Every structure is written in structure tokens, then in C-alpha cells.
Amino acid sequence: MKIKNSLKALKGRHRDCQLVRRKGRVYIINKTAPRYKARQG
């Protein structure tokens, strides 16, 4: 999982990337290609 300051660019890396908020943190999740997972922080 990558940890980035801004996730806007990471959302466009793959068409299945989704932006979700969990427990006050922002994540990118991708069920078809899990290597694109990322967290903001």
C-alpha cells in the first residue's frame, strides 16, 4: 500500500480505483488490481 499526501493523481491510475473514507482516513481501493491500494497520510 502506498502512502501519499494527495490521492487525486492515484485515482486515475486504473479505471476500477475507488476513493473511500474509513475511520477518518482516505483510501484508494481496487478490487480487480489490489496493487493500486493507497492511503492518504
Swiss-Prot record:
Top-level division of the source organism's lineage: Bacteria
List, alphabetically, the InterPro entries matched: Ribosomal_bL36 (IPR000473), Ribosomal_bL36_sp (IPR035977), Ribosomal_L36_bact (IPR047621)
Q: What Pfam families does the record point to?
A: Ribosomal_L36 (PF00444)
The UniProt keyword set, sorted, is:
Ribonucleoprotein, Ribosomal protein
GO molecular function term, any single one: structural constituent of ribosome
**What NCBIfam families does this protein's entry cite?**
PRK00831.1, rpmJ_bact
- Protein's name according to its UniProt entry: Large ribosomal subunit protein bL36
Q: Which organism is it from?
A: Brucella anthropi (strain ATCC 49188 / DSM 6882 / CCUG 24695 / JCM 21032 / LMG 3331 / NBRC 15819 / NCTC 12168 / Alc 37) (Ochrobactrum anthropi)
**Gene name in the database record:** rpmJ
